[in-house]
A protein has these predicted regions:
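Positively charged, low-complexity/disordered segments
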Residues: 1-8
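Noncatalytic, beta-rich nucleic-acid-contacting surfaces in large DNA/RNA-processing enzymes
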Residues: 9-10, 14-181
């Protein structure tokens, strides 16, 4: 017998802590997917999912400016530390897939985490849900079609294009004679 008696909510807290610890050790990708989907408050795809070196650059930059950080940047730094741990354990991210990614839920795909649409800076949950919904209706003809159907800003489309999330999806619906040559 331990000699300490836990009652009610104390028991729940202890049990929850044990479950979290078990998942972190035995099912790490499930732990990270759940954490980033539910608890992360300022996850930024562009900062955190472009490799360990880029992440380290931002962590160092934020640490240098620690006293000047906005609340959002402080939250981002907290999330960056967990991503840093994930990279150190040998795990990584795959690119967001405009047809397979979820609005707000991170997924485990081929031994990596696929971030949610909402992890793209400037893309809110409602827009992310609309993207997921429109993608389920069929393929996009172009980035222009994506912007129209998903009702996202030109800025968002530009960011996603810069990050390579559209793959070979053309910019416009218009066909050029050069496409046939």
């Amino acid at each position: 017998e331990i000699g300490v008696r836990l009652v009610g909510s104390e028991m729940c807290i202890r049990d929850r802590g044990l479950r979290v610890a078990w998942f972190k050790v035995h099912e790490p990708l499930a732990y990270y997917a759940s954490y980033f989907s539910i608890r992360a408050t300022a996850f930024d795809y562009e900062i955190m999912c472009q490799g360990r070196e880029r992440l380290e650059y931002y962590i160092n930059d934020y640490n240098r400016r620690k006293n000047e950080l906005s609340d959002k940047e402080k939250n981002t730094l907290d999330d960056m530390h967990l991503v840093q741990e994930m990279y150190a354990r040998g795990f990584g991210f795959c690119k967001i897939d405009i047809y397979r990614s979820k609005a707000t839920r991170f997924q485990i795909v081929d031994g990596k985490l696929m971030p949610a649409f909402s992890s793209i800076d400037g893309l809110g949950d409602k827009a992310a849900e609309l993207i997921e919904d429109e993608a389920s209706k069929g393929e996009f003809l172009s980035q222009e079609d994506f912007k129209t159907r998903c009702k996202v800003s030109a800025n968002t489309v530009e960011t996603m294009d810069r990050l390579g999330l559209f793959g070979d999806l053309p910019h416009s619906n218009q066909i050029s004679l050069m496409d046939f040559l």
